[in-house]
Amino acid sequence: SGYSGAALDFPVAPSLAGHYSLTNCGQPSGASKCAEGTVPQAAFEKGTCYRELYASSCHHEETQIFQYPAV
C-alpha cells in the first residue's frame, strides 16, 4: 500500500509499524532504532527499542528489544 521502495527500508515512525520494505528478500536486515516516549496523561514506559527485521522469502519478522535506563 505505497510502502515499497529502497528509500523506505527502515521507517521508525510508530504509524509505519508493520509497513517495512526490504530490498533484499531472504537476507537478514540491519537493526533500526526508535525512541519510545511518553504521551500526555498516559502511562507509557520510557525507553529505547531496537527493531530487528528478518526477511525470509519476503516474509518479514520483527523482534523488538527494549532497553530501559537504570533508575
Swiss-Prot record:
Positions with a binding annotation for phycourobilin 2: 34
Organism: Gastroclonium coulteri
Top-level division of the source organism's lineage: Eukaryota
PTM description: Contains four covalently linked bilin chromophores.
Protein role: Critical for the incorporation of phycoerythrin in the phycobilisome complex.
Binding site for phycourobilin 1: 25
Gene Ontology cellular-component terms listed: chloroplast thylakoid membrane; phycobilisome
Membrane topology summary: Peripheral membrane protein
Keywords (A to Z) from UniProt: Antenna complex, Bile pigment, Chloroplast, Chromophore, Electron transport, Membrane, Photosynthesis, Phycobilisome, Plastid, Thylakoid, Transport
Location(s) in or outside the cell: Plastid, Chloroplast thylakoid membrane
Protein name, UniProt field: R-phycoerythrin gamma-1 chain, chloroplastic
GO biological process, one term: photosynthesis
Binding site for phycourobilin 3: 58
Sites where the protein binds (2R,3E)-phycoerythrobilin: 49
Disulfide bonds: none
Subunit structure: Heteromer of 6 alpha, 6 beta and 1 gamma chains.
